[in-house]
């Protein structure tokens, strides 16, 4: 990711779900599992905090899926490995798997869009050239990218059917968590990567200071992992769009149009105006999944609209920020059964059918960012403490600006609409 920021000093730490370990690194992963689950991963800021929607922050016009998570897209799985060691290591790995099979042998179409490219998104050029994923997506810390990629490639090559493979395009994204994490130690190891990959599951997704979000900072408060989804009404296709992201960036926090960061006195460039405040720099990795049958060109258009959701939260994608979106489709019609194979075949969406998906991804991205902030709790780490977003003052500001419970203002949906 981009530059580190100075910050007012937030986080939630979670534990990945247990899963059987496989492959040559399994014994190492099992040992790491014991170490991670024995570590003090409980929130440091007290009771668990609500998601944004549970607190009355309703974003947009479309309804979320049952989980309001990227895993509402059928088959998508998420796993976390949170790495906390002593007082200085606050980092981890988050793995996003597009389906239950082998990602190399059953490839999904994909696209990458760059808002500001101050980052190290490994594997991006091949995805942009060929328009497909051939590995899971990993998120981690900046100086852990290469170790994470090496571990994922070793894990993938050990899977059945991979005996003759001689080239793998590992996709690994990052943000710089060096305020709370001793990033120069590069603490993410192979066993952490394997634990994230093999614990990946459907169902609810842990948010806040978990996995790759353990040490991140957003808008000067504790950031982390956030997720959200939208389901289109049947007459608009009924497709699902899910977003998962790693928030670690700056700006002037805006929630449903309310100037939260300004009113709380925590915003970018305040140091220039008043000789204090948070930096504009930082990064965000946004992963978008959909079950809509769209190929790489349309996925690129979809990914670009995720950046509009980012902008709504108060980001201006500064010079030192790495702002990336990776989008993929899980639809069987557009998958490809390995090198040399053609897509399975079937109808894909026309351009005219994409606008509802654009609206959905903007809404899900915006809400996922809010979730990353709402779920985070105050975290102590390598170079200080980062405070969580203060919820009651934030909700008071939102109430004052009429930014809560927007769902009550939407006219009733017509019969048959979700």
Which residues does each predicted region cover?
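Compositionally biased, low-complexity flexible segments
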Residues: 1-24, 36
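Hydrophobic helical h-region of N-terminal Sec-dependent signal peptides
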Residues: 29-37
